[in-house]
Amino acid sequence: MKNEVAISTSHLDAGATGTGLTYKDAGVDIDSGNALVQAIKPLAASTKRPGADASLGGFGAIFDLAAAGYSDPLLITATDGVGTKLKIALDSGIHDSVGIDLVAMCVNDLVVQGGEPLLFLDYFATSRLQVPVASAVVKGIAEGCLQAGCALVGGETAEMPGMYGNNDYDLAGFAVGAVERSQLLTDDRIGLGDVLLGLASSGVHSNGFSLVRRIVERSGLAWDAPAPFAPETTLARALLTPTRIYVKSCLALHRAGLVHGFAHITGGGFWENIPRVLPQGACAHLDGLSWPFPPVFRWLMDQGGVSAHEMARTFNCGIGMVVAVPADKAEAAIALLGEHGETVHRLGTIAARGEGEAVIIDHLDEAFAR
């Protein structure tokens, strides 16, 4: 894989003359690819951090773990995309925020195991490279990396005629993080009686957008119409609000010794994501009345006729990260998270599971009906 953004397709004779074909005739514009590389080099350089210089141009990126302060590190990797949220970006022509989503979906997964994001790479695939669009996307990626404290060390831009609609593109992100072996967060740290805190989301984040788009279609609203749940902005802008990046607040909590575990609430909602970090025989007992149900979710629920249970298994419903903390340290954890800009809600506790479900949410229908 090339560290610089590269054009990746099968080879044609780019030097043909006369009636012979060129690479550009086949739909691949090398000059546009080179122009993109030059446009995004300063963006990548802005994400430089100890251990990585974030300069593009080599065949591979090098990271110095010792320079980053690690002595006995474990590496943690994550990869993800933005899903069909991209369709809203494409339909509305708003491309400057989905890059933040791409980074968020990867780095928020790293922090669940106590990992500090170190470096990030992206894959941008399209049928026809549009430099302004790709530059806007990468600008968002660089902003996400700055928020997460990781270096954007490279990526791949694949211009593949015929693979996508004329102006469509797809994204994938790849993040690498590290944690000292003794600080790895595993499910055996979580115990009965632990308090569950919820960190507020910034909106829908980056999952459930196939349902979101179906609901918008049913509503008959255009993307540039005022959002019914946020009339000060357009529907597209409101739904494209980027995924919140929780890295710095959660790492601060971990380094202070105030956390037993995290669960990133993405696809599958509470029902699918919280059990991924629970020890055998434990359940998460939440009170649905303990946090506010944001207006965007109320509108989606009402407009689509979506049940409360379906909402909670599809969307984050206002909580983007669940945090398990020792009961005697809950207030200290809430205070520290607040100092780092998080809005924190006390959701419930870890209890014995017995024969029941791994996640119990009391008053769910009542809460979502408010």
Curated annotation (Swiss-Prot):
Molecular functions per Gene Ontology: ATP binding; phosphoribosylamine-glycine ligase activity; phosphoribosylformylglycinamidine cyclo-ligase activity
Keyword line: ATP-binding, Cytoplasm, Ligase, Nucleotide-binding, Purine biosynthesis
Swiss-Prot/TrEMBL catalytic activity: 2-formamido-N(1)-(5-O-phospho-beta-D-ribosyl)acetamidine + ATP = 5-amino-1-(5-phospho-beta-D-ribosyl)imidazole + ADP + phosphate + H(+)
UniProt entry tagged with the keyword Transit peptide: no
SUPFAM superfamilies according to UniProt: PurM C-terminal domain-like, PurM N-terminal domain-like
Any one GO cellular component localisation term in the record: cytosol
Assigned EC number: 6.3.3.1
Pathway connected to this protein: Purine metabolism; IMP biosynthesis via de novo pathway; 5-amino-1-(5-phospho-D-ribosyl)imidazole from N(2)-formyl-N(1)-(5-phospho-D-ribosyl)glycinamide: step 2/2
InterPro entries cross-referenced by the UniProt entry: PurM-like_C_dom (IPR010918), PurM-like_C_sf (IPR036676), PurM-like_N (IPR016188), PurM-like_N_sf (IPR036921), PurM_cligase (IPR004733)
Domain of life: Bacteria
Cellular location(s): Cytoplasm
Top-level EC class: ligase
CDD domains linked: PurM (cd02196)
Any GO BP: 'de novo' IMP biosynthetic process
Family: Belongs to the AIR synthase family.
Protein name: Phosphoribosylformylglycinamidine cyclo-ligase
Annotated organism of origin: Rhodospirillum rubrum (strain ATCC 11170 / ATH 1.1.1 / DSM 467 / LMG 4362 / NCIMB 8255 / S1)
Gene name linked to the record: purM
